[in-house]
Amino acid sequence: MSNLPAFASTAVAVTFVGAGPGAAAHLTLAAYGALQQADVVIHDRLVGPEVLALIPAHVVRIDLGKQGFGPSALQTTINATLVAQASTGARVVRLKGGDCGIFGRLDEEIEALEAAQLSFRILPGLTSAAVAAANIGQSLTRRGRNAALRIVTGHDMVGFADQDWRGMAQPGEVTAVYMGKKSARFIQGRLMMHGALPDTAVTLIENVSRADERIVAATLATLPDAAAALTGPAIILLGLLPRRAGHAVAKIKATRIQEAPLQAAPLQEART
């Protein structure tokens, strides 16, 4: 990376950096520059190994990640560590998978810094929904199809039942569900309850952008079984299927697209 532009140093105590979904190719130049200037990097578990490999050897690395439905660092511990490290005068990078402002509990960490009168800046990253859609050759919005995009999380069930399920169930709507594997059957039931058809298009993308990325083309009818077969972090795109005509998905080899067993209408009849 010797041809990269020079990066100006910054006086802020903490830089929040979105690392993208996994591949180092999706890291922004600003994010790369922040990593090179850091004294301490506090990172999540969802940060890809390719990105972690870009952290200089002399930089102190602290793993304080969260794992869905598994062992996780307490948010209070993360906040306290941020404040403690930044208070020493070290240049701290808080490295989060995807975009740090989407389901990353960014505000809680900022509030902890503000309470300690510590400065910060935010460097956004590519979020999984954007990269996943690109990897299946689709756009998240399309003129004449959907005038809005919903981004929801299936991890915290508090308030999840109160989502706009009727709106999501409408033909042509697109919703990106983060951390939705374990709530797949609930999602299916709610959408069908509000009028979504069993053959509604669904794509599940596991380990987005990584070497072991897996794309599963499904329907609403097969969503729970498709989700149950995945073992890694995944995003669910409701209302979209992989675009295959003319090899539009340049990155995807045929072996990496799987079709979930159909229990309703054939895949080619699914609504996109």
Predicted regions and their residues:
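Short hydrophobic alpha-helical segments that form membrane-spanning helices or hydrophobic packing faces
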Residues: 27-29, 131-134, 187-188
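Residues at the C-termini of beta-strands that transition into short coil/loop
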Residues: 45, 65, 124-126, 155, ...
